Amino acid sequence: MHHLRALVGVGLAGLAAGVPLTDKISVKPRQAPGAQNVVYWGQNGGGTIENNDLAAYCQPNSGIDVLVLAFLYQFGNGGNIPSGTIGQSCYISTSGQGQNCEALTAAIHTCQSAGVKIVLSLGGATSSYSLQTQAQAEQIGQYLWDSYGNSGNKTVQRPFGSNFVNGFDFDIEVNGGSSQYYQYMIAKLRANFASDKSNTYLITGAPQCPIPEPNMGVIISNSVFDHLYVQFYNNNNYTVPCALGINGNAPFNYNNWTSFIADTPSAGAKIFIGVPASPLASTGTPSGAQYYAAPEQLAAIVGEYRSDAHFGGIMMWSAGFSDANVNDGCTYAQQAKSILVNGAPCPSSGPPSSTPATAPAPTATTMPSSTSVSSPTASPTGGTVPQWGQCGGEGYSGPTQCVPPYQCVKQGDWWSSCR
């Protein structure tokens, strides 16, 4: 992924109080069957900031099935405790302590209660991670389980308290000669997954689309992945170029990926079509707009491959870019969900629900002919919403007050954002 945000310093105030663990617990399974919509959350760029309230993306009409928390981007290199910044507030130190992570911890519980899976990602487009030995990889894998899994371990730092994630993602974009060791980290995680019979966990990866894949090819060839969020963008100029095959870009090599994994331990993995969520998303600048698929283009691509046995759905980078890209009253994430559910982008009536059993019924309000500014009531949950963040919409129950000088702008019955 394109890792753009500035790293948060270690001096952030307010250590997250770890909630003591008791017995192992279970989380609510995903409610809607079929192809899934996966969105990365927690890193920003291109002048775009996602809503810092993760729970805002777990509303019934958000269109999101899996949220990937990005990133733990520092590990190895002499330190065996992964650290990083997730969102605008939560910092995980090199000692494993969570700082200012209370709100994220509460949101994780809210999202999982709504049936949205939460996956924790390692890596990103930074050079602050590497592995030197098999033993180190296994040690880090065990630590990840103890600190973020349903381990029952009370002796380690747990940044999210008693909450645990639904899996671990590997967005390895730096090789450094250490790719051969990740298989041991993944194997250690899977061995621990087997100890928790009450829950199902995911191992996911976000490889670049070229084959051979320069950074994750060896990892995929020696590990069992459940989901592969292939980045079909930013690779027009690679030795073996690939992209979505639109806008004059390199060919779409989805079929090459199904052939590649057939002879690996990941032969049963689901392949997700990874896309930028706005014209700025792939590089953080207008230069990456060529890789962006408009909703109609994305619908055509998905329509061609959705019957493939390996097809898993859509992955997008990232939540903030999706929020800033509203068409027909729908964010890009909502457009993607409509494509997966209905085979077409959002109609003017608004986005489909990821959880139909609890979705609010749409009102008979007519869509406005032009953008209007709403007058939000006081937020029941408090807090402020950054530029482009969601501040209203049918069924939305998150914060409604925008950071000054922005106003909550209604763009459809289902979506209002701070602009």
Swiss-Prot record:
* Positions bearing carbohydrate: 153, 237, 256
InterPro entries found in the cross-reference section: CBD_sf, Cellulose-bd_dom_fun, Cts1-like, Glyco_hydro18_cat, Glyco_hydro_18_chit_AS, Glycoside_hydrolase_SF, Glycosyl_Hydrlase18_Chitinase
Q: Where is the GH18 domain?
A: 35-343
Keyword hit for Cell cycle: no
Q: Where in the cell is it found?
A: Secreted
Q: What happens when the gene is disrupted?
A: Decreases the mortality of the host cotton stainer bug Dysdercus peruvianus after infection.
Q: What is its EC number?
A: 3.2.1.14
| Location of the region described as Disordered in the Swiss-Prot/TrEMBL record | 343-390
Q: What class of enzyme is it?
A: hydrolase
Coarse class of the protein's main subcellular location: secreted
Active-site residues, record numbering mapped to chain: 173 (proton donor)
Keyword Chaperone (UniProt): no
PROSITE patterns, per database record? CBM1_2, GH18_1, GH18_2
Its family?
Answer: Belongs to the glycosyl hydrolase 18 family. Chitinase class III subfamily.
Q: What is this protein called?
A: Endochitinase 2
* Gene giving rise to this polypeptide: chi2
